[in-house]
Amino acid sequence: MKEEAFLRRRFSLCPPSSTPQKVDPRKLTRNLLLSGDNELYPLSPGKDMEPNGPSLPRDEGPPTPSSATKVPPAEYRLCNGSDKECVSPTARVTKKETLKAQKENYRQEKKRATRQLLSALTDPSVVIMADSLKIRGTLKSWTKLWCVLKPGVLLIYKTPKVGQWVGTVLLHCCELIERPSKKDGFCFKLFHPLDQSVWAVKGPKGESVGSITQPLPSSYLIFRAASESDGRCWLDALELALRCSSLLRLGTCKPGRDGEPGTSPDASPSSLCGLPASATVHPDQDLFPLNGSSLENDAFSDKSERENPEESDTETQDHSRKTESGSDQSETPGAPVRRGTTYVEQVQEELGELGEASQVETVSEENKSLMWTLLKQLRPGMDLSRVVLPTFVLEPRSFLNKLSDYYYHADLLSRAAVEEDAYSRMKLVLRWYLSGFYKKPKGIKKPYNPILGETFRCCWFHPQTDSRTFYIAEQVSHHPPVSAFHVSNRKDGFCISGSITAKSRFYGNSLSALLDGKATLTFLNRAEDYTLTMPYAHCKGILYGTMTLELGGKVTIECAKNNFQAQLEFKLKPFFGGSTSINQISGKITSGEEVLASLSGHWDRDVFIKEEGSGSSALFWTPSGEVRRQRLRQHTVPLEEQTELESERLWQHVTRAISKGDQHRATQEKFALEEAQRQRARERQESLMPWKPQLFHLDPITQEWHYRYEDHSPWDPLKDIAQFEQDGILRTLQQEAVARQTTFLGSPGPRHERSGPDQRLRKASDQPSGHSQATESSGSTPESCPELSDEEQDGDFVPGGESPCPRCRKEARRLQALHEAILSIREAQQELHRHLSAMLSSTARAAQAPTPGLLQSPRSWFLLCVFLACQLFINHILK
């Protein structure tokens, strides 16, 4: 009784000054038009209320105890002899003031409940139970994780330090059951009764990406405690937390406006049968934020009934101001998705000086002795790929990272993708190509040789188009060293794929680093492919003279579809040339045999273009101070969230030693990495397990490396929301996927925007650690839902809006099945291509071998005799 009185006092809508009146308990009903309260009101006021209490018009909503105000009999009269009573102006003013007080009290109580929930989630002292449990993953293997049980939620961390968040389980939608097991310990299971997701998208501190663990199921979790006593304690604690889970709905649901019928969770048919309702989803809206700002915004998300237009407009303006003030916190501009990899902006960046100063270096006496020791082992023309270079010539970053220097001006490609003129597109592509060379280290430095299986990923945010360019690279071969990379920005309409084989040659006083390979730039909306090649790096003055690093060679940028080609020649400094003759470049743009323009200048400074028909040259490209300030900001993965073979984490100790000037320690750390690579190679050789890249595959026909998850389909603004990356996999978040995921979280919306039960689809993959959501998903139709109303069954389908009609749902399911079939066929074709060469060779060998005769073996003669005997027996029976 005390608890009921406390809850009634806590969620009451009436102002403290009003006193409830006695009503007949047989004539009570719940007010389902206001979410968050369960106050009881009389069904037929007038008889049980005070004699002088005026009855309210029907459009004013159900009467409340505080609205039954005493009015003198003279202040009301009959309306045209009917049974309805008219409310006097005095009573109407009193009702309006009382309703305002109720709404203000409602907001304060809801805000207080929200703060209590936020405090329970973030306060480390509010813990029901915390201990280590083994959790079974999707691959049937067990992982020991730290579980923290709070009211309504189960927080899972990687370690007891509560720093590496893995996921959050929402207990309000879960059932608990003991699970028999033949293994030691005590096993129990948390599951969703309708096989939907039990995970929250964000953590208690707003984390969008969890720590990397083995994949966990989306609709259930199987736990194992060390002993039966510990397991029983967890069962009791979980049952207690399940009783408290109703408080979590204040944070998980985004209630609609109370002025519209059916927006209350208690009033909706879906909530009455235990199923969540859907809501309209904005593309940039968080799917399930569990941070302070979003929970505070929930306190202002509900609106009471509208008395008049003026009050409605005022409340809407106040609500929008409160929402804006609390929703733009911890929000990166243009963040496309909340479930992708976490990226942080790189603050420091070394660009180097323009001109010859950054390409010349004087070697110290100590380093000269190391160089002489190394040169004694070399012969002219020798390949340097297997030679271990001293660490003082190393640039403190991997070669995979260095290949990303070409995308700091990827906004030029965004402009080229929407350019209608083919010649102008070629010039923009050429300008982007030149923008990747002026960033150079101070002095003559060589990046790290990537370890086999090493990966690097980063992205650049485009503020003009609110998009991101993602860069994924992997070392797919060690001998020869091959680096494969993929760049994608589907929203802006371009992607780049390619591979580079690094080769080096020693020529006595000089050496050259050759970048053998090509890259293919594709404009998705036009299906245009531009093939690009790379110059080589030439270092001279090793034995005598000044050590200088230059770029040389001829490169081409060619588009076969529109027949445009750009040719560039990087010129080495001549023997008697001055400072102006270094880094020279010349080239031309042609269309077939016709020369359209010629270029000249310096690749790290000004480049001029002279078009045919014009008598003067114009500035084509210059890395001026303004251009440098317009560089896109690179975002990389935080070090603690990187995998073991990601570049920055892999080489962190070598980089730290080089930055401190400790060459001895850098050499030791570098040797340890190389020795570990050799050990892994020996283990693979002993186990006869060939190396298989994680993100790229080799086309057996063209012998080119391709990204496994590349998507060349044009961007669809009506369906596609944002492109995101998770674990090196690039995917696209779509409207249907967001609407389905929000449906699982139980977000109620206005009645005319609420989707029916058949629209609730279960996602194929919904992992707590930020595993990417595929746009393809399997369907799941609950059977225990109430039927849709006529209002919900009519109308066209709008993503995130009204419910689709049965015909649209049937067509969507048919298209989904067709799409999945096409994907499976494509995967089978890729697998067939992969083994094509092996099959052809085995077929050739089989053709050369002599084919045995049909009746050369005794077994064949025996079978023939048995067959003839059976035939004779059958003929005898039939006669």
Curated annotation (Swiss-Prot):
PROSITE patterns in the record: OSBP (PS01013), PH_DOMAIN (PS50003)
Occurrences of domain PH (ranges): 126-243
Binding site for a 1,2-diacyl-sn-glycero-3-phospho-L-serine: 384-389, 449, 504
Subcellular location: Endoplasmic reticulum membrane
Composition-biased stretches (Basic and acidic residues): 300-309, 316-325, 750-765
Composition skew (Polar residues), residue ranges: 766-783
Residue ranges crossing the lipid bilayer per the database entry: 860-878
Organism domain of life: Eukaryota
Phosphoserine: residues bearing it: 12, 747
GO molecular function: cholesterol binding; oxysterol binding; phosphatidylinositol-4-phosphate binding; phosphatidylserine binding; phosphatidylserine transfer activity; phospholipid transporter activity
CC annotations in GO: cytosol; endoplasmic reticulum membrane; endoplasmic reticulum-plasma membrane contact site; intracellular membrane-bounded organelle; membrane
Keyword Transmembrane: yes
Coiled-coil ranges from the UniProt annotation: 93-123
Tissues where this protein is expressed: Ubiquitously expressed.
Residues where a 1,2-diacyl-sn-glycero-3-phospho-(1D-myo-inositol 4-phosphate) binds: 384-389, 446-449, 478-479, 670, 674, 678
Region annotation (Disordered) ranges: 1-73, 254-341, 742-806
InterPro entries for the chain: OSBP_sf, Oxysterol-bd, Oxysterol-bd_CS, PH-like_dom_sf, PH_domain
Keyword tags: Coiled coil, Endoplasmic reticulum, Lipid transport, Lipid-binding, Membrane, Phosphoprotein, Transmembrane, Transmembrane helix, Transport
GO biological process, one term: phospholipid transport
Membrane topology: Single-pass membrane protein
Family: Belongs to the OSBP family.
Function: Lipid transporter involved in lipid countertransport between the endoplasmic reticulum and the plasma membrane: specifically exchanges phosphatidylserine with phosphatidylinositol 4-phosphate (PI4P), delivering phosphatidylserine to the plasma membrane in exchange for PI4P, which is degraded by the SAC1/SACM1L phosphatase in the endoplasmic reticulum. Binds phosphatidylserine and PI4P in a mutually exclusive manner. May cooperate with NPC1 to mediate the exit of cholesterol from endosomes/lysosomes. Binds 25-hydroxycholesterol and cholesterol.
Miscellaneous comment as given in the Swiss-Prot or TrEMBL entry: According to a report, the gene is imprinted in placenta, where it is predominantly expressed from the maternal allele only. Not imprinted in other tissues. According to another report, it is not imprinted in trophoblast stem cells.
Protein name: Oxysterol-binding protein-related protein 5
